[in-house]
Amino acid sequence: MKYDILEPFKEYLYSQLPANTARTYYAAVNKLFKDIQFNSLEQIDKDWINEKCREQFKTRNEYSAVKNGLKRLKEYDSMLQLPSEDEFHAVSIKKRNRRKKPPKTIYLKPTQRKINQLSDEKLRYAYRLAMVSGLRVSELADLEASDIEINNEKIFVTVKHGKGGHGGKIECSPDSYLQKKLPEFLVKHKTDERLFYSEVYLRQKATELGIECHDLRRIFAITTRNALKKEMSVEEANAIVQQRMRHARFSTTKRYLFNRKLKFEYENVKEEGEE
């Protein structure tokens, strides 16, 4: 059956690639094959693959993920027949670079209130930690009890499997609530036990709250820079934010700090007036 092939392939990807890349490639391949059944990869027609990839994957990044995932699948099982590189390229160049999104506004205080009102402490701690650490949701889901350290009223988080291999130890922004609650939470878990829910579940629950998980990382970048600017030069503050975000280039960090399609406000004035 299909998943007798795909599940071992998933393990193969994780053994060959960084976790985030493996996750992206597998998700794309799994999406492609979602509505078909097969017992062997040689049963899949390469023309069907070409047409289905063209229809299902709208942006260049999405198309690249499924193309590279399929190439890895062929490495894993040579029975798979793929379109030629020229055929892949002919489709790729017609894809737009990214989905067009309307400008959005992130409201800090309403986001914090939504998180603080959560009755599930695992979700509440996870989302608050994301706001003060800048962790991606995949990194948050991977955290074990031994990855969090609290010293001298400071919280440190160790990321072992960051995007692009950029892990490291991160000093979190001050949060007196987490400084008090996390030690009590950590002692309930073994050192190698996952602290929070899966990435899929964290995203799902955030969506139900009306929050995008990556907005918590954006909040971290902006609030950290604003706080640091009061103590040092703008250049020094920018460098520290880049380091804590674990970006190889400041041009990546700039997309969080100076994105013209993104507005950052402390309060939703309309929401406050309506209340």
Task: Give the ranges of each region predicted by the language model.
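Short pre-functional
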Residues: R124-S138
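Long, amphipathic, Lys/Arg-enriched alpha-helical "connector/arm" segment
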Residues: K94-K122
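N-terminal core-binding DNA-recognition domain of tyrosine recombinases/integrases
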Residues: L6-R99
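Conserved tyrosine-mediated DNA breakage-rejoining catalytic core shared by Y-recombinases
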Residues: L143-Q179
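Short, basic/aromatic-rich helical patch in the C-terminal catalytic core of site-specific tyrosine
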Residues: L140, L216-M232, V241-Q242, T253
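Catalytic-site neighborhood detector that most strongly recognizes the C-terminal catalytic loop/helix
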Residues: M245-E271, E275
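Active-site/catalytic core of tyrosine-dependent DNA strand-transfer enzymes
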Residues: S173-F220, R225-A227
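Short, polar N-cap/turn motifs at the start of nucleic acid-interacting alpha helices
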Residues: I150, K230-L257
